[in-house]
């Protein structure tokens, strides 16, 4: 393969990359740490190291929604991605290629290494968020990965697009498990903080889960959560 990665589907699944309106001056290159820029400016850059240094940002960026609730030592983006990937290995549905699920799970939030963890309450609109993520995945694949391994660049791009556009059963499962893992984490924080943090808005994601298997997991989680709060209320009123 020698062609530059120019997949025409945007992360919204319908807008061609060439037609995406650039609503701001934000560019992924502007978010790259200076020491990585210094490496890339060398006559013979170490592209693997540069890419890993960018991905490292996922390990130190904490999840915005939890920070907004005052959970200072909350999980990082990569914490979420790791457990999500583990959960995909547990899928029982025989139609599903679990290895493909793991690949998709590992890259689904990789653009957040430069974009950050933007939430619905942030002042950045959904269209702009998607544009930034699309520009970032193109930058990561074409500018950092492709010079070293063109096949890997295409595979990562394809896996990321599969998730964004939900073009396979595996992508659908990862979408659902992404929400399920978040709900598990929310319930863990609710127990840690003895119900003093309100995660009700997060549990609105239950309605958007599509696959029967993940629906079953989620139903069990919701029942456990309801019992926890019933028991907590009872202990307080005694």
Curated annotation (Swiss-Prot):
Subunit: Homodimer.
GO molecular function annotation: 5'-deoxynucleotidase activity; GMP 5'-nucleotidase activity; metal ion binding
UniProt name for this protein: 5'-deoxynucleotidase YBR242W
GO cellular component terms, semicolon-separated: cytoplasm; nucleus
Sequence ranges assigned to domain HD in this UniProt record: 77-183
Binding site for a divalent metal cation 1: 80, 108-109, 178
EC class of the enzyme, as a word: hydrolase
Highest taxon listed in the record's lineage: Eukaryota
Co-factor: note: Binds 2 divalent metal cations. Shows activity with Mn(2+), Co(2+) and Mg(2+) but shows no activity with Zn(2+).
Catalytic activity: a 2'-deoxyribonucleoside 5'-phosphate + H2O = a 2'-deoxyribonucleoside + phosphate
Species this protein is from: Saccharomyces cerevisiae (strain ATCC 204508 / S288c)
PANTHER family registered for this protein in UniProt: 5'-DEOXYNUCLEOTIDASE HDDC2 (PTHR11845:SF13)
């Amino acid at each position: 393969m020698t062609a530059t990665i120019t997949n025409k589907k945007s992360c919204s699944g319908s807008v061609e990359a060439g037609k995406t309106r650039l609503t701001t001056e934000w560019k992924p290159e502007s978010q790259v740490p200076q020491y990585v820029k210094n490496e890339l400016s060398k006559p013979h850059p170490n592209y693997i190291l540069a890419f890993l240094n960018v991905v490292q940002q996922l390990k130190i960026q904490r999840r915005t929604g939890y920070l907004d609730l005052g959970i200072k030592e909350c999980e990082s983006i990569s914490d979420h991605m790791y457990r999500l990937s583990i959960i995909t290995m547990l899928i029982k549905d025989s139609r599903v290629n679990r290895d493909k699920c793991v690949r998709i799970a590992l890259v689904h939030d990789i653009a957040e290494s430069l974009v950050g963890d933007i939430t619905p309450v942030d002042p950045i609109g959904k269209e702009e968020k998607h544009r930034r993520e699309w520009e970032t995945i193109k930058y990561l694949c074409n500018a950092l990965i492709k010079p070293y391994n063109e096949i890997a660049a295409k595979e990562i791009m394809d896996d990321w697009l599969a998730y964004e556009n939900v073009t396979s059963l595996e992508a659908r499962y990862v979408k659902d498990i992404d929400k399920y893992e978040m709900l598990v984490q929310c319930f863990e924080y609710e127990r840690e903080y003895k119900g003093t943090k309100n995660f009700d808005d997060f549990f609105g994601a239950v309605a958007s889960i599509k696959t029967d298997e993940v629906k079953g997991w989620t139903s069990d989680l919701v029942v456990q959560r309801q019992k926890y709060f019933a028991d907590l209320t009872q202990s307080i009123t005694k």
